Amino acid sequence: MKNTKIKETIERLHTQVNEFVDEGRYQDYLKFINKFWNRSAFNQLLIYMYKDKASYVMGYKQWIDKFNRIPVACIVCRAIAVKDCNCNERKAPVRIPQLAPMTYKKENELGEEEEKMFFRDVYVFDISDTEPIADLPVKEIVSLLEWVDVEIEDINLENKLIALINDKGFDFKYDDTGSDTLNGWTDYARKEIVVSNDRPKAQQIKTIVHEIGHMLAHDITTLGDMLAPRELKECEAESIAFVVLDTLGIDTSSYSVGYVAGWTNNEEDLLIDSIQTVSKNAKFILEYLQDSKPE
């Protein structure tokens, strides 16, 4: 039964997540997911668990139809009639499970049609486990974010980030923070983000993205966020900023993202919740920037 299979996949994810989210590998994971920023947090985790060197994944039929490539395995030899293939020399491709959302319509008790959602398990393959199909032209794979080749000084990036803040109902301003170490803050009561006016532009942009992370992910007016450790919230905001800036190709070599597992007491559910928070909000920011790209 497929539901059982999906449940087993999720259970495996929960039990293994602590194995890589340690002090040495968490930041590597954040760097890894920038290649898959538009996938769900669960699917990002699954790709990393099954093939942490993956760079571009797609389903079996998609590889064939879109890029004239095919996952390498013995069955492939038969499919494309390679008669002289020595199957013993071929390495089976890694089948990476993914949870694909599906929708259907069903009548409720009032006879009204409602849209329902369920998940089915599918498999994808990394490009490293594929090869071009003989006698067909090779098609180039273009990055989804090819247009965002930004510089940290780019005024358009700054304007888009400030527009995002305004669209979420917050004001933004540069001001004197009164401290050499305080780069900025998010004021939830006044619905305002303030960033230091005397920092280099690169630092200002990084701080803006960090504070947007707080704005989207945290709300001190709710009990859950009030009780959450400040260090965890800082780690989540810094993680969001790291994923966004790294995906945009902006230098993140100076970043030292905190130890998220330490602030969730290594509890799998809390740890995955935190990873989902980072993934969801980084994706929101990147989609906003992509949707507001200039014509």
Give the positions of each predicted feature:
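N-terminal accessory/interface modules of nucleic-acid-binding and processing proteins
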Residues: 1-236, 240-295
